[in-house]
């Protein structure tokens, strides 16, 4: 759910959209930007007090990032998706944000499809009542994962679906030899999740 540093700007996802998201993901493992009451039907929630940006993310994720600072949240999602910890994700973003620099990592290297929602959204307030006014701009539901056909099929009646890319099917799940975290690679013999761990491991071997 969306939250900002200004309580008056809190905007929560409408129920009809949450049902679509649950259907696409076949259940939500994590809502990393959850409202205080944890209204989203997810297995795990990170509220403002938990600070989702300070936590590891995994499984199927629904992210409706804070309006005031979506870039850090999107980047955090991309990192954990490429590591293999996040298996599927849906991100709710204003259409105008899709071309921003902060969304480049998401749209160019991570997302596999998106749907331009056919109607403007009317969010809920902190009491979960309809705020009574439509958003001033259209929104998109951005999908990250291998089940693009499922996503596009289940959202086609709510807007215009767009396929971005198909992920390689020969991707293997591996564990980083240095940090122990899971990551995806084309070779099952891959040892490190990234250049940082590779460099640290090399320095460690030199010092021994």
What residue ranges belong to the model's regions?
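Class I S-adenosyl-L-methionine-dependent methyltransferase catalytic core
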Residues: 1-176, 207-208
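BZIP DNA-binding basic region
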Residues: 169-208
């Amino acid at each position: 759910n969306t939250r900002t540093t200004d309580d008056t700007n809190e905007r929560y996802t409408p129920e009809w959209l949450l049902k679509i998201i649950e259907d696409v993901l076949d259940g939500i493992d994590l809502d990393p930007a959850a409202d205080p009451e944890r209204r989203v039907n997810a297995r795990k929630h990170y509220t403002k007090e938990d600070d989702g940006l300070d936590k590891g993310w995994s499984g199927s994720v629904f992210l409706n990032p804070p309006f005031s600072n979506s870039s850090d949240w999107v980047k955090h999602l991309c990192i954990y998706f490429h590591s293999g910890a996040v298996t599927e994700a849906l991100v709710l973003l204003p259409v105008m944000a899709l071309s921003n620099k902060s969304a480049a990592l998401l749209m160019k290297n991570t997302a596999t499809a998106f749907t331009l929602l056919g109607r403007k959204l009317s969010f809920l307030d902190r009491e979960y009542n309809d705020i009574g006014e439509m958003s001033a701009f259209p929104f998109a539901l951005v999908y990250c994962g291998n089940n693009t056909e499922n996503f596009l099929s289940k959202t086609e009646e709510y807007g215009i679906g767009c396929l971005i890319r198909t992920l390689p099917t020969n991707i293997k799940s591996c564990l980083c030899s240095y940090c122990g975290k899971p990551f995806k690679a084309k070779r099952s013999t891959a040892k490190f999740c990234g250049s940082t761990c590779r460099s640290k491991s090399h320095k460690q071997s030199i010092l021994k």
